[in-house]
Swiss-Prot record:
The active site is at D144. It is an enzyme of class 2 (transferase). CDD domains: STKc_IKK_alpha, Ubl_IKKA_like. One of its GO terms (cellular component) is cytoplasm. Residues 455-476 are annotated as: Leucine-zipper. Its main location: cytoplasm. It catalyses: L-seryl-[I-kappa-B protein] + ATP = O-phospho-L-seryl-[I-kappa-B protein] + ADP + H(+). It comes from the Eukaryota. The kinase domain is located in the N-terminal region. The leucine zipper is important to allow homo- and hetero-dimerization. At the C-terminal region is located the region responsible for the interaction with NEMO/IKBKG. GO terms for biological process: cellular response to tumor necrosis factor; positive regulation of canonical NF-kappaB signal transduction; positive regulation of gene expression; positive regulation of transcription by RNA polymerase II; tumor necrosis factor-mediated signaling pathway. This is Inhibitor of nuclear factor kappa-B kinase subunit alpha. The gene is CHUK. Serine kinase that plays an essential role in the NF-kappa-B signaling pathway which is activated by multiple stimuli such as inflammatory cytokines, bacterial or viral products, DNA damages or other cellular stresses. Acts as a part of the canonical IKK complex in the conventional pathway of NF-kappa-B activation and phosphorylates inhibitors of NF-kappa-B on serine residues. These modifications allow polyubiquitination of the inhibitors and subsequent degradation by the proteasome. Its EC number is 2.7.11.10.
Length: 740
């Protein structure tokens, strides 16, 4: 494996050099990995004999790195003992290893030829802005900010940007002006390029140039020319000018606005242009803006914080396939946001359904800020999906995104010959257009997926209600069976004792009414028709889940995008001399991509309409299930009440029967002091209301029977008379409690 120059064979012990990460003016940065511990560090070593001045600068970088501690500045660490030796008479510099490569590598990807995504731009703005602010607070000017000196690291699934290579950094604690070293020319502030005195505002120019390139895909001022050339043409630009390009006539066109295409949403474009006007001011004294007296920091950092703190909700209108963005003021209610959506889309608030990516409906009780995730920025990172509940048929596809002027020019005449240098710009926009068509489909597919997840949530709720309904129906059925059997038995026993015991027409009528009600409630518990509808919906949903249109269908579009990227790569590798070429192959790809998007969107919206139709069936069915469940619960409650009421009546009858028994005992005790007892008849033994007096033991019972055998006939006569008298008294009792 390759060793960095000067590193002797066998040196490093358990540390093994894995790859060369980069090469600078006189230094190499290599990745070292511990063979046993799986630790990784970046080692910067000198590859040349250094002059005294450069050796001092090398050592100065190490001193600066060791005293810095910030999340967006790469950290220095101790050189492992096995590697701690001099190379070319200077020490090594050990740093944390960032595995994501540098920003230049990201910008060079063909898919980023027209700039990065909004989320990436805002992440870079936040990270590098924070790192620069930290360096300046510590009186350090970097002086060589460029994409090659910004590295990326994955931290818990989030990409962090870190500033590296402080070899040209200047510690200005001895004074505010420096006239020493000149860094990379393309990103260099004008005063450094002209070797004039400078301040920390040189980093503003470099930072602004980098951010502009991340937005547009190229540097702001005549990016195809060498700095010596474009400086002379740009130096007298208006302070608000942030972009300059050369027309076919050779005339330079200036603009205070960002060029198109780019990925920024409309709400961010203006504040970003204002920020770039501060950062790209040619005058170093005006660059960055005045210091805010309250916040005690330059205007550029105040505006940067404002941009990063904007709460913007991005909503994909699934009825039109268009994205609408809203700036959320503090504490705005969801209803207020929906009113703004109505004005923008014409969908009234009552018909709006806003779904998260997980298919969860937004909570109207919570503020509108629930549409924005903490720490997540950019319309490419998080979207809310708008549906019109009054519609179940979506008529897509809709018109494809519009072509830029350049792309439209070659589409109208694909055989027109253009210079290679101009064709690169046109084809870059063509790649951006093809990628945009694929992304438009991906967003709509994500909206369809949110609708599917919402449908499944409704289906889960319906299933729970179905299970509750079936359980309640089964319980009602069991209770009705018990009630029916028990009331039949009670009516039979009541009929048996009527001729010799207690009777009440009111009570008998009430019991028979209960029996009729129970028969009616049995019909309430019949839910088979609802079960059939629910099972039919379950089957329909399963078919929708299995449908190929429920899965991403953009394979052909991805293939076409890759073909466009490959064509663009080939063009970039061609020499930019005076040769010309046409755009026939690129235009074919554009046309095929539009046709492919049209086809997959027809399939997508057809499937989406089925999803929404199925969901509407569930919405229509849920009230019926709720009503059936409510009726069953009401019937259940009524049956239990009737059962309890009848049991109270039976106990009341038992109380009356006991009163009769007590009366018989009193009559018997008045007959010459003798209280003979007769064995109960079979009828009395079986009747639950018979008052049975039980002797204390068997011997006493036998004695009592023997003593009273002689009085049996006389006692029977007395009891018969007492029964007749008591029967007459029953008619005068208060039976009003039966109607309670």
């Amino acid at each position: 494996m390759e060793r960095p120059p000067g590193l002797r064979p066998g040196a490093g012990g358990p540390w093994e050099m894995r790859e060369r990460l980069g090469t600078g003016g006189f230094g190499n940065v290599c990745l070292y990995q511990h063979r046993e511990l799986d630790l990784k560090i970046a080692i910067k070593s000198c590859r040349l004999e250094l002059s005294t001045k450069n050796r001092e600068r090398w050592c100065h970088e190490i001193q600066i790195m060791k005293k810095l501690n910030h999340a967006n500045v790469v950290k220095a660490c101790d050189v492992p003992e096995e590697l701690n030796f001099l190379i070319n008479d200077v020490p090594l510099l050990a740093m944390e290893y960032c595995s994501g490569g540098d920003l230049r590598k990201l910008l060079n990807k063909p898919e980023n030829c027209c700039g990065l995504k909004e989320s990436q731009i805002l992440s870079l703005l936040s990270d590098i802005g924070s790192g620069i602010r930290y360096l300046h607070e510590n009186k350090i000017i970097h002086r060589d900010l460029k994409p090659e000196n910004i590295v990326l690291q994955d931290v818990g699934g989030k990409i962090m940007h870190k500033i590296i290579d402080l070899g040209y950094a200047k510690d200005v604690d001895q004074g505010s002006l420096c006239t020493s070293f000149v860094g990379t020319l393309q990103y260099l502030a004008p005063e450094l390029f002209e070797n004039k005195p400078y301040t920390a505002t040189v980093d503003y120019w470099s930072f602004g140039t980098m951010v502009f390139e991340c937005i547009a895909g190229y540097r702001p001022f005549l990016h195809h020319l060498q700095p010596f050339t474009w400086h002379e043409k740009i130096k007298k630009k208006d302070p608000k000018c942030i972009f300059a390009c050369e027309e076919m006539t050779g005339e330079v066109r200036f603009s205070s606005h960002l060029p198109q295409p780019n990925s920024l949403c409309s709400l961010i474009v203006e504040p970003m242009e204002n920020w770039l006007q501060l950062m790209l001011n040619w005058d170093p004294q005006q660059r960055g803006g005045p210091v805010d007296l309250t916040l005690k920091q330059p205007r550029c950092f105040v505006l940067m914080d404002h941009i990063l703190n904007l709460k913007i909700v991005h909503i994909l209108n699934m009825t039109s396939a268009k994205i609408i963005s809203f700036l959320l003021p503090p504490d705005e209610s969801l209803h207020s946001l929906q009113s703004r959506i109505e004005r923008e889309t014409g969908i009234n608030t009552g018909s709006q359904e806003l779904l998260s990516e997980m298919g969860i409906s937004l909570d109207p009780r919570k503020p509108a800020s629930q549409c924005v995730l903490d720490g997540v920025r950019g319309c490419d990172s998080y979207m809310v999906y708008l549906f019109d509940k009054s519609k179940t048929v979506y008529e897509g596809p809709f018109a494809s995104r519009s072509l830029s002027d350049c792309v439209n020019y070659i589409v109208q005449d694909s055989k027109i010959q253009l210079p290679i240098i101009q064709l690169r710009k046109v084809w870059a926009e063509a790649v951006h257009y093809v990628s945009g068509l694929k992304e438009d489909y991906s967003r709509l597919f994500q909206g369809q997926r949110a609708a599917m997840l919402s449908l499944l949530r409704y289906n889960t709720n319906l299933t729970k209600m179905k299970n509750t309904l079936i359980s309640a129906s089964q319980q009602l059925k069991a209770k009705l069976e018990f009630f029916h059997k028990s009331i039949q038995l009670d009516l039979e026993r009541y009929s048996e004792q009527m001729t010799y015991g207690i009777s009440s027409e009111k009570m008998l009528k009430a019991w028979k009414e209960m029996e009729e009600k129970a028969i009616h409630y049995a019909e309430v518990g019949v839910i088979g028709y609802l079960e059939d509808q629910i099972m039919s919906l379950h089957t329909e949903i399963m078919e929708l889940q299995k449908s190929p249109y429920g899965r991403r269908q953009g394979d052909l579009m991805e293939s076409l995008e890759q073909r466009a990227i490959d064509l663009y790569k080939q063009l970039k590798h061609r020499p930019s001399d005076h040769s010309y070429s046409d755009s026939t192959e690129m235009v074919k790809i554009i046309v095929h991509t539009v046709q492919s998007q049209d086809r997959v969107l027809k399939e997508l919206f057809g499937h989406l309409s089925k999803l929404l139709g199925c969901k509407q069936k569930i919405i229509d069915l849920l009230p019926k299930v709720e009503m059936a469940l409510s009726n069953i619960k009401e019937a259940d409650s009524t049956v239990m009440f009737m059962q309890g009421k009848r049991q109270k009546e039976i106990w009341h009858l038992l109380k009356i029967a006991c009163t009769q028994s007590s009366a018989r005992s009193l009559v018997g005790s008045s007959l010459e002091g003798v209280t003979p007892q007769l064995p109960p008849t079979s009828a009395e033994r079986e009747h639950p209301l018979s008052c049975v007096v039980t002797p204390q033991d068997g011997e006493t019972l036998a004695q009592m029977i023997e003593e009273n055998l002689n009085c049996l006939g006389h006692l029977s006569t007395i009891i018969h008379e007492a029964n007749e008298k008591q029967g007459n008294n029953m008619m005068s009792l208060d039976w009003s409690w039966l109607t309670e």
